């Protein structure tokens, strides 16, 4: 009997196994209800404490509504939430030209300053020539509601409507042998230098003016001309404007009986190699010489060196090369609004390297900062007219000097060099509190063009 009872128990156990298995393994939806991780609930004291962003959103993951409860301000909540969700899209400063970046979820928005547009404020709206010169490489003028670019002589406008392309190897203003590593730049301290007006001179010196300059290597000042008197001596400088025209100062012409010109030289001590070019005519103000020989420019004031400008016409054309290139003639607006608002200009010459010392045999060059008109006028006992401007250093001993008169004051813009001034006069050379005074070429553009058009 016992064996039969044991067999019945075993059969009953085996019969019940499938039912037991089905009760242990639950369906996924039912199981998930039991296996979910419950969020820690705040304690009674946490619920009554003010919202804390670190507790709510850093230690734990929070919702936007929880963040809003902390900030209690919709704008602050949006700013935080945009960064919290996917990081700060503005961290790389994507907005150009000082645009303001606002972060978003998966994006950002740039708010641009006036005259700029684009997703990153990268597009400049050149509606005015006063904004980066209308993006023009040379000259800019406003035509209706747009800007229109044009170029100096011997250049053509590029296909982009902004750039200027040289049409020849010796187009004006091209420094073919660029200064590269020897760039004549302003010393760092000059940028913060303030003008101090010191002791004034008793007399102006008309025959200025390169003190403490560096050597200008061959081809680095290709527009430089040198005026030679009947004794074969250097007495003034000049600027090549065309194959037959050299710009100089009017007061230079009254210093000698005859004038010859040298170009393309950096060392005039080697007289056997230099070539003197003959002069055909000189156009200067009538108060210097008989009117039947010179072109008349009205109102020249010899005492104040006002209208200190003259043009020499050559008998035979100057042969251009990489060492002999004319400076470009700017428009008046371009000179006043762009060139003369640059930090500095370049002055060169063979004048005296120290006050009352011999002239230099080698061509010297310096960079001189522009001086604002008010400071310029206060620094001098003599009249600074509208036809003049100042350039130079208040305390640094660098300046033009005797023998440099008539030479070029050049300003570079986008790798093109324009004539902006004529070395005219000064009170000594590189004197503390004094500046070099230059003829303002922009005032004479129509006169220069008229003279150059004469046959």
UniProtKB/Swiss-Prot annotation:
Residues 1-20 form the signal peptide. Belongs to the peptidase S1 family. Snake venom subfamily. Its EC number is 3.4.21.6. InterPro entries: Coagulation_fac-like_Gla_dom, EGF-like_Ca-bd_dom, EGF-like_dom, EGF-type_Asp/Asn_hydroxyl_site, EGF_Ca-bd_CS, GLA-like_dom_SF, GLA_domain, Pept_S1A_FX. It comes from the Eukaryota. Gamma-carboxyglutamate residues are formed by vitamin K dependent carboxylation. These residues are essential for the binding of calcium. The O-linked saccharides at Ser-92 are a mixture of Xyl-Glc, and Glc along with smaller amounts of Xyl-GlcNAc, GlcNAc, Gal, GalNAc, Xyl-Gal, and Xyl-GalNAc, suggesting that the glycosyl transferases responsible for this modification are non-specific. It comes from Tropidechis carinatus (Australian rough-scaled snake). Residues 210-453 form the Peptidase S1 domain. Activated by calcium and phospholipids. GO terms for biological process: blood coagulation; induction of blood coagulation in another organism; proteolysis; venom-mediated blood coagulation. Coiled coil: none annotated. The active site is at residues 251, 308, 405. The modification 4-carboxyglutamate is found at residues 46-47, 54, 56, 59-60, 65-66, 69, 72, 75. The keyword Membrane does not apply. The lineage of its organism: Eukaryota, Metazoa, Chordata, Craniata, Vertebrata. Snake prothrombin activator that attacks the hemostatic system of prey. This protein is functionally similar to blood coagulation factor Xa. Induces cyanosis and death in mice at 1 mg/kg body weight during blood clotting. Glycans are attached at residues 92, 254. Heterodimer of a light chain and a heavy chain; disulfide-linked. Residues 41-86 form the Gla domain. The record marks 103 as: Not modified. Gene3D superfamilies: Coagulation Factor IX, Laminin, Trypsin-like serine proteases. This is Venom prothrombin activator trocarin-D. Disulfide bonds join 57-62, 90-101, 95-110, 112-121, 129-140, 136-149, 151-164, 172-328, 216-221, 236-252, 376-390, 401-429. It catalyses: Selective cleavage of Arg-|-Thr and then Arg-|-Ile bonds in prothrombin to form thrombin.
